Amino acid sequence: MIIGANTSKNFFDNLEEEQIQQCGIDLRVWKIFKIEGEGVIDFSNEKRKLPNYIEIFNSEKDEHIKLDRGVYIVKVADYIKIPENVAGFAYPRSSLLRMGATLYSAVHDPGYEGRPEYLMQVFNPITIYKYARIAQIVFVECRDVKGVYEGIYKGR
């Protein structure tokens, strides 16, 4: 069952009232990066190598950015602390989709905390203003959790 926004808002610090939706929380853009170079992924993560991220936008310094077709990494401004019995799923806001862009996200595991990063694919040029609400995250209760997230992205 989805955990309502009246509860899930407590997984964040410093939310604006406009971010609290019916059953989820809107997430705001903080930084946008271009991806350069090759990534490497394997079964054990021993060979894992992320490509280079080149920062092209920062909501703390920039007013807006026009993004052309392509793929980008978006880091959100909102710091999340997910409880040990909860998982999160992020989706693009419908306004973003209607403008010709989308986001791709992995599962936000129980115990994850930090500012998530998403892959944004732009099909039609789009202008994004600082702290624009681009995604909505919903949370679900998990039973029989095997453990909590302790990976390299925790706290980032």
Swiss-Prot record:
It catalyses: dUTP + H2O = dUMP + diphosphate + H(+). Keywords: Hydrolase, Nucleotide metabolism. The keyword Hydrolase applies. Its EC number is 3.6.1.23. HAMAP family: dUTPase_arch. One of its GO terms (molecular function) is dUTP diphosphatase activity. Homotrimer. One of its GO terms (biological process) is dUMP biosynthetic process. Belongs to the dCTP deaminase family. Archaeal dUTPase subfamily. Coiled coil: none annotated. InterPro entries: dCTP_deaminase (IPR011962), dUTPase-like_sf (IPR036157), dUTPase_archaeal (IPR023537), dUTPase_trimeric (IPR033704). It is an enzyme of class 3 (hydrolase). Pfam families: DCD. Pathway: Pyrimidine metabolism; dUMP biosynthesis; dUMP from dCTP (dUTP route): step 2/2. This is Deoxyuridine 5'-triphosphate nucleotidohydrolase. NCBIfam families: PRK02253.1 (NF002598). This enzyme is involved in nucleotide metabolism: it produces dUMP, the immediate precursor of thymidine nucleotides and it decreases the intracellular concentration of dUTP so that uracil cannot be incorporated into DNA. The keyword Nucleus does not apply.
